[in-house]
Amino acid sequence: MNQNEHPFAFPETKLPLTSNQNWQLSTQRQRTEKKSITNFTYQEFDYENISRDTLERCLTTIIKHHPIFGAKLSDDFYLHFPSKTHIETFAVNDLSNALKQDIDKQLADTRSAVTKSRSQAIISIMFSILPKNIIRLHVRFNSVVVDNPSVTLFFEQLTQLLSGSPLSFLNQEQTISAYNHKVNNELLSVDLESARWNEYILTLPSSANLPTICEPEKLDETDITRRCITLSQRKWQQLVTVSKKHNVTPEITLASIFSTVLSLWGHQKYLMMRFDITKINDYTGIIGQFTEPLLVGMSGFEQSFLSLVKNNQKKFEEAYHYDVKVPVFQCVNKLSNISDSHRYPANITFSSELLNTNHSKKAVWGCRQSANTWLSLHAVIEQEQLVLQWDSQDAIFPKDMIKDMLHSYTDLLDLLSQKDVNWAQPLPTLLPKHQESIRNKINQQGDLELTKELLHQRFFKNVESTPNALAIIHGQESLDYITLASYAKSCAGALTEAGVKSGDRVAVTMNKGIGQIVAVLGILYAGAIYVPVSLDQPQERRESIYQGAGINVILINESDSKNSPSNDLFFFLDWQTAIKSEPMRSPQDVAPSQPAYIIYTSGSTGTPKGVVISHQGALNTCIAINRRYQIGKNDRVLALSALHFDLSVYDIFGLLSAGGTIVLVSELERRDPIAWCQAIEEHNVTMWNSVPALFDMLLTYATCFNSIAPSKLRLTMLSGDWIGLDLPQRYRNYRVDGQFIAMGGATEASIWSNVFDVEKVPMEWRSIPYGYPLPRQQYRVVDDLGRDCPDWVAGELWIGGDGIALGYFDDELKTQAQFLHIDGHAWYRTGDMGCYWPDGTLEFLGRRDKQVKVGGYRIELGEIEVALNNIPGVQRAVAIAVGNKDKTLAAFIVMDSEQAPIVTAPLDAEEVQLLLNKQLPNYMVPKRIIFLETFPLTANGKVDHKALTRMTNREKKTSQSINKPIITASEDRVAKIWNDVLGPTELYKSSDFFLSGGDAYNAIEVVKRCHKAGYLIKLSMLYRYSTIEAFAIIMDRCRLAPQEEAEL
């Protein structure tokens, strides 16, 4: 390799890097310990009819002219300038006689080698000799040392030398050394603890929270993709003219279009953007790194582009002229320690070379890579046209996402550069057209006509055609269609005698059984509205619902002792008496659009809210499912869901409308897989419909006890919570041809609104997707500003169509807040988060508010907090849901100062739970109670919920706070079984199986061991009596009376 000596003597042997260079280099090294990534700018230019010798001579002249090219970047964060440096002879690849496909491959290989190189050389140059006397020049600059304007200067000076003009002499006083020392001295004067500096940092929003598919640190190597937008000279001048008319710079106009696009894909109104600003007025003609990054909080959405761009101009000027210099290196370090939202600060950049720059020559190819930049936009003028260079690390993002962002940017840029455009008009939608088209198509699928029938009508039609078919099986009892209809008509007659009129609300408060189905059919036949109110909640809460719903008559079971009235406001009618009444001869005439039922769900203010669903809304869902899966007279469903849980609506009316059979279990058997398996096998159940946790329990039990029950199920429908990725295969291990269906929706949208037939589960899936809307239902994914989110962007799921509830009963304010009417379409805001995949598939991403799903029940944490705060002595309480797959509730309590448990312990966890049981259903009472002196707070002064979650994994004063030792032989027997299953752990009388680490799998193993020891324990008993003390008593009773369910 021939070498030429570099004659330029630099005045210093080494030079400290600037803060910006330190940041770039340190970030690069953080990501290059095991990865292939460096900071560089790479350009390719073609030169025609110029000899190679001439080109080499001119390049050598430029390199000798600029001392930076003689430097070496070392590991000590200094630039070293050897006394004698050398210029390597440029590599040459002769392709002058190669075929086109070979040339294309060689050029691609060259680019790949150059861009993936980990060389720290300041400049690397090679030639490709192409046919037709063309030389392709490949130049790679180390961008830690050479900035974008310097790259431009390099090629301008090459053009100057090739034209025969000499280079100007460098100013020996304005050098790189002078610049670096000046910047570093300025940094020394910055007080990083000053209030003004911290004020600036803390007011910055996060960078655009773009969807990603991996963390940058996990990339094996980085490929940079450059995409370019070109705006004609005419349109560019129009954009400049309009910008100046509104007193904004063209740079801020281009950056504001960028922030608008980033805002949509980042699901945020405000975002941080890094402007790479080069201050070179005093350093003209010098190649080096003069970039001073500036972090600016940009607006991404306003009512018009004019208000947005003017706002951003103001924000930029405030940041630029801020009275305290804000070094980016220190900014980034501080931001990354504030919160997770700043985990990757300053990773999106905007830069420009629009002033006094017009590249006479256009680059053939190029790209720019920085370890701390995921996406950059660089604006330049080439041959009088605006060229916008988008450089992105595509491997970080979902496929084609950056391309879609580029198209939206192009569309908005084209619109704003039109002649006579009005920037004060509302911003147009930027959702890519192809995405909009796919969503419109899937939201209009299906040919299902809106039903004009009532929810119960098809059942009574089936009575006429198949009167002797089995309608219900419950243990040894069964009812055929005609008998069930007879009971329902008599019940309707009894309700009429009790004064119930069409449109009245009638409560159903009884345990699971035949009576529930008789009751709801009878209520609907009488033209009334059924309101299921669970017995598994305090009487005070039940009566609050009765009063709120305007209920006078309550259908009960004669054996339910909990239904003793506390006053004479309500008339209690047991269904066994009701079916002995004179039957109602013909059904009450009701419009299909009128309410069929009201289901009360948890309310954030502490008061449950009643969801009002119409006949046609609910029946439309039932018909859609029945048609899709060909549900018919030979189908039987195991009905596990409680009546106040809307899966029961399909269990009852879906099957009875199709002529099928409902197989019931008792209230105590609803959590007992032994009973489920027996019912499935004995009664040939073909369908399963439940929350995922119950089906998981069925499969686990079947595997442990060698049951064939899952193989009987031709159709499994799961909804109401996350579905484990392993469930489809575990099910198909029993039945290869079984249909596994994932569903979702909201009580406010008639049972379900979406469906997905799960065939295979790809490795890359994070969860089972929601799928697609059911016929006559629609979905939108919407951000906080009401914009439809692009593919992969998380937003709130809105449901539209014929299943939408009529609102919340007697609560106009809540109805208006959740049910929106836009352009003639009704939408329900679910509070669930989701995103679209490019093919139109919906993915569920969890809740956005304080509402959670626990055991399939939708729970407002706010309602639990209201109940906790009602307890005397509680200063403040916070409830959270803990866990991913199997969530449990935990509550944190700060007592009034004079009643803090640390001092006087006036309350313990068990007392809190007893008090909550008087206000809330059992499933809403937290299993874990933790007392605190104060709540942990975030930097913004809010309760730190993540810190609370971490506390649940540490030993605190919890529901096991009173650790009474195990003393009886029975308790010791239980403790040994638990230790065998859970592993060695310290157990006490009050130790809770599930809080001690137990789950559904462990619970089944406990039951299995109990059976081997001669105790006929049911799984439901462990769920019901989950402490050592309670379970020991139950075990003893089961030993004495194995055929009976013992009661404490």
UniProtKB/Swiss-Prot annotation:
Mutation effect (residue 267 to N): Increases anguibactin production. Does not affect ability to grow under iron-limited conditions. No change in virulence
An annotated GO cellular component: cytoplasm
GO biological process: amino acid activation for nonribosomal peptide biosynthetic process; iron ion transport; secondary metabolite biosynthetic process
Induction of expression: AngR transcription is regulated by iron.
Outcome of swapping residue 889 to P: Does not produce anguibactin, impairs ability to grow under iron-limited conditions and decreases virulence
Short name of any one Pfam family annotated for the protein: PP-binding
One Gene Ontology MF term: ligase activity
InterPro entries for this protein: AA_adenyl_dom, ACP-like_sf, AMP-bd_C, AMP-bd_C_sf, AMP-binding_CS, AMP-dep_synth/lig_dom, ANL_N_sf, CAT-like_dom_sf
SUPFAM superfamilies, per database record: Acetyl-CoA synthetase-like, ACP-like, CoA-dependent acyltransferases
Keywords: Activator, DNA-binding, Ion transport, Iron, Iron transport, Ligase, Plasmid, Transcription, Transcription regulation, Transport
UniProt pathway annotation: Siderophore biosynthesis; anguibactin biosynthesis
Domain Carrier: 965-1039
Known role: Bifunctional protein that plays an essential role in virulence. Plays a role in both production of the siderophore anguibactin and regulation of iron transport genes.
Similarity field: Belongs to the ATP-dependent AMP-binding enzyme family.
UniProt-recorded name of the protein: Anguibactin system regulator
Biological source species: Vibrio anguillarum (strain ATCC 68554 / 775)
